[in-house]
Each structure stands twice: as C-alpha cells, then as structure tokens.
UniProtKB/Swiss-Prot annotation:
The active site is at residue 64. This is NAD kinase. It is an enzyme of class 2 (transferase). Belongs to the NAD kinase family. It comes from Lachnoclostridium phytofermentans (strain ATCC 700394 / DSM 18823 / ISDg) (Clostridium phytofermentans). GO terms for cellular component: cytoplasm. NAD(+) binds at residues 64-65, 140-141, 151, 168, 170, 181-186. Its EC number is 2.7.1.23.
Length: 285
C-alpha cells in the first residue's frame, strides 16, 4: 500500500498528537497521505467526498462509532478501513496506539488480509407503504427500542413471511456478524465470527420465558412489526441503525431487513485473529 487517508476523531485525539505522529511516520516511509478536513493538520487535506479513488487504505482513529461512521462515508469509494483504537473496547479497531508503528510495519510488508463483511438493509413501511427514502444499510445492527419513557412495546418477528415470535419487552436487535460483539452481546446474544454470513435476532429484556436469540442465514428476510398496545400513543418505538440514523415508529409499522448488496472492507493484520481479539478485549490471557 502506498496511498493512505487519515480520518481522526478530534474528541478522542484532541491535539491531534497521534494523528501527527502517524502522518509523519507514513510520510517518512515514502507514503502519500491525505488527511480529512476534520483532522486538519498541515499538508494535503481533503474532505471525505474528495478523497482520491486510488487511495488504498483509510486509517480511522477513534472508537467503534468513529469507524462505523467513516465506513458509511467511504462505502461508495470501496476503500478498505484500518481502525486505530482510541476508544474503550474497540472491536472494529485493528491497532492499539502503543503498537502502532509495529503494526504499520506489517502493513508495509504486505502482511495483511482484507476482510469483506456483510451488511444488512433496513426498509421502513408505514401504512403498508415503503419509505424508499428511509432505506438504510447497517454494518453493525438495526435496533428497535421503546420510545423515551414509554411502556414496554410489543413486537412480532417474521422470517421469510412466517411469524416465529411475539413478545413484549424493551425491543429487539437485528445484527450482522460484525455487530454480534456490540449491543447484541450486551443483550445476551451470541458471538459470531465476522466472516460468517448470517443474521442474529436478539430480544432486549423480553417479558417472556420463551423469547431467545434466533440465527438465520443471510438469504433469509427478517421483518419486525410494532404491535398495537392497549393504550396506543403517538410514538411507540424508535428504530436506530448503527447508532446514528433513527426514526420514530407507530403501531403496525414494519421494518424489513435483508442482506445488503454493499459490503464493508476491513484490513486485518496477520497474527491478529478474531479469537485473539476476543481474548484481549475481555481480558482473558
């Protein structure tokens, strides 16, 4: 790899010290580096839309939220992403700041792989009509939760048009394998290797003894319907995609979820397996 761009979260790297160190290190090794305006250093700057198509890798400094946002911004450019963890757990990040230079040495020696990971599309239906303007893609998850301080909500889960679960609770998470270590994990859902092609459906605090996580193939379609409550209110629930896009839902609204055509590409260095990452993040030796 010879051409890079750097996207930094200034809330995580306030004085851009880490960004500056990385820029100098890459340029000292003969690499061409672009830095987004949000990162604002000296040199060749560009916003995300102006990043040249021949950039081979986007280096993102921040937590998982920063990496997710950058991945969405760069999706149409099809640029692989290498995350540098400035957050807490950082499951999407490949590099820790303390081992940054050693990690980049592997990159320069072509000791890496590019993982192509599946995404999911979510389309909202209101009164039976698809809101095409509200079709969004998720790298991690689509989360449907109760609105504000409302009561628990009722949901119906359909797979390929067939109802499989009805329950009341705080909501439901539909996640990709990449998102299985996020909110899905916190809600008691399964951990799935990110190379898998499947969709996880995990209830959030269900008021039921029978509601459990369900795993389906990537060829299946999942549909969530908001059920009517005894005391219907204007805003029953909220759907959130990758922690950013959100939309209010009413009773009988539906969300159709299926595998997306787009895929996100993440750089993985040799010797950094998913299971090694799990042991490291969870503190197991």
């Amino acid at each position: 790899m010879k051409k890079f761009c750097i996207i930094a979260n200034r809330d995580k790297d306030e004085n851009l010290t880490i960004t500056q160190t990385m820029l100098e290190f890459l340029e000292a090794n003969g690499k061409t580096v672009y830095v987004t305006e949000e990162s604002c250093l000296e040199g060749s700057y560009t916003d995300v839309s102006g990043i040249p198509k021949d950039v081979e890798c986007a280096i993102v400094l921040g937590g998982d939220g920063t990496i997710l946002q950058a991945a969405h911004d760069l999706l149409q450019l099809d640029i692989p992403i290498l995350g540098v963890n400035l957050g807490t757990l950082g499951f999407l990040a490949e590099i820790e700041t303390l081992t940054m230079k050693q990690a980049f040495s592997k990159l320069f020696l072509n000791q890496y792989n590019i993982e192509s990971r599946m995404m999911i599309d979510a389309t909202v239906f209101k009164e039976g009509q698809s809101l095409s303007s509200h079709k969004v893609s998720a790298i991690n998850d689509v989360v449907i939760t109760r609105s504000g301080f409302s009561r628990i909500i009722g949901v119906s889960i359909f797979i390929n048009g067939e109802v499989v679960q009805n329950y009341r609770g705080d909501g439901v998470i539909i996640s990709t394998p990449t998102g299985s270590t996020g909110y899905n994990l916190s809600a008691g859902g399964p951990i799935v290797t990110p190379k898998a092609e499947m969709i996880m459906i995990t209830p959030i605090c269900p008021h039921s003894l029978n509601a459990r996580s369900i795993i389906v193939t990537s060829d299946d379609t999942v549909e969530i319907q908001i059920r009517e409550s005894k005391k219907t209110q204007e805003e029953e629930a909220i759907v959130t995609v990758d922690g950013s896009f959100s939309m209010e839902l009413q009773a009988n609204d539906r969300i159709l979820i299926k595998k997306a055509k787009e895929r996100v590409k993440l750089v993985r260095l040799e010797g950094h397996s998913f299971f090694h990452l799990l042991r490291t993040k969870f503190g197991d030796k």
